[in-house]
């Protein structure tokens, strides 16, 4: 027992709600032990059946699903729908059932997982006995005696009662049919009497006054409606004028769009031109790079040459100092010679030669100083050229960076322009055909401009190549001249050394030898000096010419470099200006695009609002016109009716309290025929689940409609707040139908109400809606088509037929009259997909 207590019961762990997932139906209190047993149960939506589920018979007090007595597999129901209820039946064979042991059993539904999802009320298996077939019931004579009968006898008595009730009901129906025929005959008699009776002049006069008052009210309403129509027409005209203005503005905006598109095309063409210019500038930059490399090489050569020239200048200065010393010595010698000449009284010709030699020496000194100054100037010019070269290199590097940045900006601008072009093509797919001719023309013009630019660039490249070749030739000439200068300087040095040695030798000879006659010893050195002076003058002249030529070449090279630098600066300025212009044009285009989009969106909204307002005004105008026509028709009908002193057919309402008959059978609420299977056991009579005579009832006797219904109200589905267009007034509808039946079907069994026009009914015209009067029993006719329906036709189907004539919007369920224009209806449906907001006020 302790082990059994420790094992937890599965029933305690399961939720109590799981037992209600399968409901067992019609479970009796007892069953025969050896007879087949049918088990009826319902699968709710909370359980999913499985082929391995089973239904077992358990003894009351079971603890686990294994404590079953017998079981059957629960078959899968046919045409099972998930999450829906399903009724099933299983039949247990008699030889599997327990015997009459006095124990209580119950049905349990067990899933394939071993979970119990349903349990029935307890029952027993008991053998049949004659006492079970007996029932006790009270005597019908209202005595205190109890009568014992069998079930079969009780059922036979009930069947006899139901048959008698059926016969009585048949008799009642025949009587009612006869009464209906009598009432119809009576109604026909009343109609004939009503046609004959025309003596109610007082009633007619009062009705005339009421009609006149109603006609005046209707006239006032018609005047107001006409005034409203005039106002609406004026509003429509104003709206049409506004639409014309809006269309004109839209056309102007379209022209602006076309101009903007042309500007865009021009900008794209300029962009292509700039790309071509960039390509050509790249080529020029490459050429400039090559030229810079060559100029750098030449500059290095020139620097080396300048250094050599500086060395030569130092050597020349040394030589000049040496020559000065020698000149001083020569002057001393000349002074000695002059003294000697004075002493010897030489001829005046010798004096003139000495003066000439002095002048030549002075000239040589001046030329030497001039050459030194020219060398210093050349060095300065070379330094300036080097500085300019450095500046040009820096400018070229900055220009390269600028071109790279411009290239990136152009790429971004191209991407943006391509995106805008795609967007414009998507937004305006129909504008491509119109722009084809303009595009071709613009492309031809752009091609011509590109060809012209190519020719110009080719000419500039050829010119640059020629200039580059000239620069190379000049550089070669400069190299040759520097080499010649070096050779001449070397020769001059050698000659100066030779002259210095000869002068030193002459001075030594003069110092050593005594003075002799002037024509023998002094004439030779003077002649040599003259020859040396002539040679030096010639060399100096050649050097000055070479310096002059070099100077001219350097000046030309500087001019060319400055011209190239100016060209590069101009190109950079032009490029920057073009970039600024492109940026400004892009910004303007972006601003114009945004403005145009905003304006176009606003105009579209205005157009949609105006079109919708025009449609509403037209609908209102149509409503007012129809309302005025209806009022005029009513006035004409009432005036004619009053003039002829005739009145519509009157008849009594057979459904009122005065003419209503008492019901033949009192109305009773139907009771449960088979009882509640889950009711308490106290209500059951006996232990075997037999039927209680109080619970066993015949079919509920339905009371006649004469006693149950006071008024018949047609249930009409809810409609829009606004009254549908083109729908006639139900009162007028009924009146029209009655008059038609009077004119066309005089022999039919139709009934007309007493028609008394009331101003309150006319005032409630707009609030009446679409419904039918309760007492209207004649044939139902569709107000929109000539189809008629019998009086007992289903009201829902009749309303569905009437609504089928109307056009219903699939998005907002707004109804349109049958004569509504299809384009207006489609435009209304399209407004739901355009993103525009509709107001249904």
From Swiss-Prot:
GO terms for molecular function: zinc ion binding. Zn(2+) 1 binds at residues 782, 785, 801, 805. It comes from Xenopus tropicalis. GO terms for biological process: apoptotic process. It comes from the Eukaryota. Residues 741-751 have a biased composition (Acidic residues). This is Tax1-binding protein 1 homolog. Zn(2+) 2 binds at residues 809, 812, 828, 832. A zinc finger (UBZ1-type) spans 779-805, 806-832. Transmembrane segments: none annotated. Residues 431-441 have a biased composition (Basic and acidic residues). Residues 173-560, 612-640 form a coiled coil. Residues 419-441, 678-759 are annotated as: Disordered. Keywords: Apoptosis, Coiled coil, Metal-binding, Repeat, Zinc, Zinc-finger.
């Amino acid at each position: 027992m302790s082990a059994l207590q420790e094992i937890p019961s599965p029933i305690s762990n399961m939720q109590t709600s799981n037992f209600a997932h399968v409901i067992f139906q019609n479970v009796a209190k007892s069953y025969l032990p050896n007879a087949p047993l049918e088990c009826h149960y319902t699968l709710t939506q909370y359980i999913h059946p499985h082929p391995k589920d089973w239904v077992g018979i358990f003894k009351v007090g079971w603890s686990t699903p294994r404590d079953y007595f017998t079981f059957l597999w629960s078959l899968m129901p046919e045409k099972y729908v998930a999450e829906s209820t399903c009724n099933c039946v299983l039949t247990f064979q008699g030889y599997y059932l327990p015997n009459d042991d006095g124990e209580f059993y119950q049905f349990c539904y067990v899933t394939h997982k071993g979970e119990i999802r349903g349990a029935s009320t307890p029952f027993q298996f008991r053998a049949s006995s004659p006492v079970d077939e007996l029932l006790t019931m009270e005597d019908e004579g209202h005595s205190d005696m109890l009568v014992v009968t069998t079930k079969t006898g009780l059922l036979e008595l009930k069947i006899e009662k139901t048959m008698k009730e059926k016969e009585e009901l048949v008799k009642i129906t025949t009587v009612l049919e006869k009464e209906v025929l009598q009432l119809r005959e009576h109604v026909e008699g009343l109609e004939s009497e009503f046609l004959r009776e025309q003596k109610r002049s007082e009633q007619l006069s009062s009705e005339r006054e009421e009609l006149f008052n109603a006609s005046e009210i209707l006239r006032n309403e018609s005047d107001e409606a006409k005034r409203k129509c005039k106002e609406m027409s004026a509003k429509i005209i104003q709206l049409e004028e506004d639409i014309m203005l809006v269309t004109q503005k839209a056309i102007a905006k379209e022209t602006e769009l076309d101009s903007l598109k042309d500007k865009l095309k021009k900008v794209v063409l300029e962009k292509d031109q700039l790309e071509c210019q960039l390509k050509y500038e790249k080529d020029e930059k490459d050429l400039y790079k090559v030229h810079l490399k060559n100029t750098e090489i030449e500059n290095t050569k020139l620097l080396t040459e300048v250094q050599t020239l500086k060395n030569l200048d130092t050597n020349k200065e040394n030589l000049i100092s040496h020559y000065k010393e020698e000149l001083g010595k020569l002057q001393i010698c000349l002074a000695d010679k002059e003294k000697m000449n004075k002493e010897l009284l030489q001829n005046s010709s010798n004096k003139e030669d000495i003066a000439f030699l002095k002048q030549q020496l002075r000239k040589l000194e001046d030329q030497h100083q001039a050459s030194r100054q020219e060398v210093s100037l050349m060095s300065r010019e070379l330094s300036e050229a080097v500085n300019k070269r450095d500046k040009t290199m820096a400018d070229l590097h900055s220009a390269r960076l600028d071109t790279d940045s411009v290239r990136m900006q152009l790429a971004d601008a191209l991407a943006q322009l391509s995106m805008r072009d795609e967007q414009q093509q998507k937004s305006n797919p129909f504008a491509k055909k119109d722009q084809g001719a303009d595009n071709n023309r613009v492309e031809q013009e752009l091609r011509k401009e590109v060809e012209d630019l190519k020719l110009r660039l080719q000419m500039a490249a050829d010119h640059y190549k020629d200039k580059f070749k000239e620069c190379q030739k000049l550089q070669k000439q400069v190299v040759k001249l520097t080499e010649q200068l070096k050779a001449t300087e070397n020769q001059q040095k050698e000659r100066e050394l030779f002259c210095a040695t000869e002068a030193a030798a002459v001075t030594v000879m003069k110092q050593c030898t005594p003075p002799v006659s002037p024509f023998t010893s002094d004439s030779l050195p003077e002649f040599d000096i003259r020859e040396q002076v002539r040679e030096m003058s010639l060399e100096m002249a050649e050097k000055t010419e070479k310096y002059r030529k070099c100077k001219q070449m350097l000046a030309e090279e500087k001019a060319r470099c400055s011209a190239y630098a100016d060209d590069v600066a101009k190109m950079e300025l032009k490029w920057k200006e073009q970039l600024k212009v492109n940026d400004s044009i892009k910004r303007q285009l972006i601003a114009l695009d945004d403005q145009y989009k905003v304006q176009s969106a606003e105009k579209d909204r205005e157009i949609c609002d105006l079109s919708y307002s025009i449609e509403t005004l037209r609908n209102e105008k149509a409503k007012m016109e129809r309302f005025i026509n209806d009022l005029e028709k009513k006035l004409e009908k009432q005036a004619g009716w009053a003039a002829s002193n005739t009145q519509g057919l009157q008849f009594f309402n057979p459904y009122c309290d005065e003419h209503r008959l008492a019901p033949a059978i009192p109305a009773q609420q139907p009771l449960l025929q088979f009882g509640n299977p889950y009711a308490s056991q106290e209500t059951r009579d006996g232990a075997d689940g037999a039927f209680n005579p109080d619970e066993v009832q015949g079919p509920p006797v339905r009371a006649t409609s004469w006693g149950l219904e006071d008024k018949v109200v047609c249930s009409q589905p809810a409609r829009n707040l606004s009254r549908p267009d083109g729908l006639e007034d139900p009162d007028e509808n009924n009146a029209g139908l009655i008059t038609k039946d009077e004119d066309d079907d005089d022999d039919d069994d139709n009934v007309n109400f007493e028609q008394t026009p009331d101003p309150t009914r006319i005032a409630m015209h707009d609030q009446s809606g679409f419904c039918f009067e309760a007492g209207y029993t004649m044939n139902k006719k569709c107000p929109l088509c000539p189809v008629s329906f019998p009086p007992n036709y289903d009201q829902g189907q009749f309303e569905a037929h009437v609504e089928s004539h109307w056009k219903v919007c699939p998005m907002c369920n707004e109804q349109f009259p049958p004569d509504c224009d299809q384009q207006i209806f489609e435009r209304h449906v399209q407004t739901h997909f355009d993103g525009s907001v509709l107001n249904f006020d």
